[in-house]
Amino acid sequence: MLMKKNASFEDFFLLLGFSNWPHLEVVLFVVILIFYLITLIGNLFIIILSYLDSHLHTPMYFFLSNLSFLDLCYTTSSIPQLLVNLWGPEKTISYAGCTVQLYFVLALGTAECVLLVVMSYDRYAAVCRPLHYTVLMHPRFCRLLAAASWVSGFTTSALHSSFTFWIPLCRHRLVDHFFCEVPALLRLSCVDTQANELTLMVMSSIFVLIPLILILTSYGAIARAVLSMQSTTGLQKVLRTCGAHLMVVSLFFIPVMCMYLQPPSENSQDQGKFIALFYTVVTPSLNPLIYTFRNKDVRGAVKRLMGWEWGM
């Protein structure tokens, strides 16, 4: 009886995605494919360059490489499925596939929230505690911070995704989204989901609001340090590196807050799809451009790498 009531691994979900706008599907396919390729190329470029050039073996670029790898995994967890659904008439995903997708989307999104806090602490230590920076950001400690970001994401996701799929899905298998996400799946349940919705709100507050508060606190201290600087060169370098990180933080947290920290409503469902599309497709493609644009360290690394290749 329980097997009949609950979904089995042979069941499928139908991802409605952008089926309300069939005339946009071809355009969306092309645009999303372009952004996905930019994401792959840009983030792989940062990872490879940071690995090959010894001058970039610093805490800042170590964390940036982790962020790039996170973005690669995050987009790959949902975008290929979306492209397949946009290209052809088949818009289904298996129960097992939906479970795996939800797990990785939650895990990688949570890990990115924590990693952005770690990166803001690195900037705080560099600007406000420059004499103690090498001690504060010891390579071993940096590896521990990066590992903590990943572990917190995957641990939290294991609990949250299990809690989501624990409820019986008694209705149709129509998921009104382009990937498996918690609010869309909760709408398929025929039982009271207030506990799940409360859990979602609490987890969103812990891993969205608290990281954002910590980041803003770090940059408040950085702002005070910047205002007291006498060196124009130092000021420009701080503004360049911290400005890039602040822009990345804004592009990630603002859409996520609009998505998960507002009351659910029927009217906002379509709007939510485009918000989710922004932080899963656009933001990961912009991060490499933001960090490398007019970045002297990256330009120098490219010149050294090209010079080494030509010298060979």
Swiss-Prot record:
Biological process annotations from GO: detection of chemical stimulus involved in sensory perception of smell
InterPro entries, per database record: GPCR_Rhodpsn, GPCR_Rhodpsn_7TM, Olfact_rcpt
Keywords associated with the record: Cell membrane, Disulfide bond, G-protein coupled receptor, Glycoprotein, Membrane, Olfaction, Receptor, Sensory transduction, Transducer, Transmembrane, Transmembrane helix
Main location: membrane
Transmembrane segments: 27-50, 59-80, 102-121, 141-159, 197-220, 238-260, 274-293
Pfam family, one: 7tm_4
Membrane topology, Extracellular segments: 1-26, 81-101, 160-196, 261-273
Glycosylation site list: 6
Stored CDD domains: 7tmA_OR2B-like (cd15947)
Location of the protein in the cell: Cell membrane
Cytoplasmic membrane side: 51-58, 122-140, 221-237, 294-312
Recorded topology in the membrane: Multi-pass membrane protein
Gene3D superfamilies for this protein: Rhodopsin 7-helix transmembrane proteins
Disulfide bonds listed in the record: 98-190
A GO-annotated cellular component: plasma membrane
Described purpose of this protein according to its UniProt entry: Odorant receptor.
Family that this chain belongs to: Belongs to the G-protein coupled receptor 1 family.
Record protein name field: Olfactory receptor 2J1
Phylogenetic lineage: Eukaryota, Metazoa, Chordata, Craniata, Vertebrata
